[in-house]
Amino acid sequence: MVRHFLLSVPISVLALLLNAMPLAASDCIDLQGSLMQGGLVWGRVAPGSRVTVDGSPLDVLPDGTTVAGFGRDAAASAELLVEGETPCRQTLQIQSREYNIQRVEGVPQDTVTPPPERLERIKRERQLVGSAKARYLARPDLLQDALAGFAWPAIGPISGVYGSQRIYNGTPRSPHYGVDVAMPTGTPVLAPSAGVVTLAEPDLFYSGGTIILDHGFRLSSSFLHLSKLHVEVGQEVQRGELIAEIGASGRATGAHLDWRMSWRNQRIDPQLLAPPMPEPAAPAP
């Protein structure tokens, strides 16, 4: 019998309300988004400016839009430097978060501690996923669509949240980097924003059926544990387009969608970029 136990310190309501609200201002840049661990922020500088965060250069779109993301365990502050027509330096204060502890029982043990003969496959698949996320797609139109706000790829109960420390069958494993939506196998998965498919694999060891959707400039969404894929690599999809169906493939104890997001090599929280989860539609009489 599969059992789930969730010991949680919830994300503060204030943190979620910060989504897409102005965060900070200086003489040259106003930031929007969520300036916290797992958050994504964006703003506009003079076109042609050079922007860095802690010395790492950021992409600057032709209209001056620039984006930065912060991982689960980001430091408490980061230095933003803008050089160009309107130079400035700004210290970004990054809000810390407390994360859930989630105990999951009943997972097949070979997906918790894989046998030696599985390790080569796991390594190969990690490289495949890494390559798909590392592709550089210079599409300002896709990124602008994403920054206008993501839609939920599936509507339903949230059964797992970003950042949780996962304990499988009593064994601590890596944190969970996505948000889980628990719905039956076959439930449609829709593109939360426009993008280009960079990975479409029906059976990866941990994530089962998996799609990666590139939203431009190394901002991407991943969709895990799918039962059926409706897209292929290289295909461009629009917001709301059917891309897959929910399943229980890979390391899963039941049917659900695991939606993840990455900016460069930082894993960010999709829930901070989406509106509150809508109520499921009432069944037809």
Predicted ranges, named:
Residues 24-98:
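Cationic-aromatic interfacial patches
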Residues 1-4:
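Positively charged n-region of N-terminal signal peptides that target proteins for export
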Residues 209-215, 219, 235-282:
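Conserved, short, structured surface segments that act as functional micro-motifs
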